[in-house]
Amino acid sequence: MGENTSLEKATFGAGCFWHVEEEFRRVPGVVSTLAGYMGGWKEHPTYEEVCSKTTGHAEVVEVTFDPAAVTYDHLLRVFWDCHDPTQLNRQGPDIGTNYRSVIFYHSPDQERAARASLEHEQRSGRHARPIVTEIVPAATFWWAEEYHQHYLEKRGGGSCRW
């Protein structure tokens, strides 16, 4: 960790949080990752409630990082690379608004960076369809149940990626 550096948070939804957490956990400069829920109206949601699509929440990963060791722009690159941002309310076989592509920004600087990154990604020619990723202010982060935390790491790797 950088000397006298404050840690920052970034929050991303890109489908099943098991895979997304595993992608960010491996990035040098990321201090911690947590699987959880954000963006809905139900307080203290459970996994079953979120999967029922009645809470408005997305499965997300809260990333705590040292900005002296890894930039927010680099985390955005990981986000774009770990899912298909052109799929509306789904990733592969996982279907529903809880699997939506979303960037929850924690500051005006993060919002600007996320919007610029989306524009760049759209112009890159990497995607045949328009990007549907939402960019919205961060809301209350609700931790997912313990068995979801570091799910793939606890099982020796693997992937839930389609």
Curated annotation (Swiss-Prot):
Reaction(s) this enzyme catalyzes, per UniProt: L-methionyl-[protein] + [thioredoxin]-disulfide + H2O = L-methionyl-(S)-S-oxide-[protein] + [thioredoxin]-dithiol; [thioredoxin]-disulfide + L-methionine + H2O = L-methionine (S)-S-oxide + [thioredoxin]-dithiol
Keywords: Oxidoreductase
Pfam families registered for this protein in UniProt: PMSR
EC number: 1.8.4.11
Disulfide bridge map: none
Function per UniProt: Has an important function as a repair enzyme for proteins that have been inactivated by oxidation. Catalyzes the reversible oxidation-reduction of methionine sulfoxide in proteins to methionine.
Protein name, UniProt field: Peptide methionine sulfoxide reductase MsrA
Gene of this entry: msrA
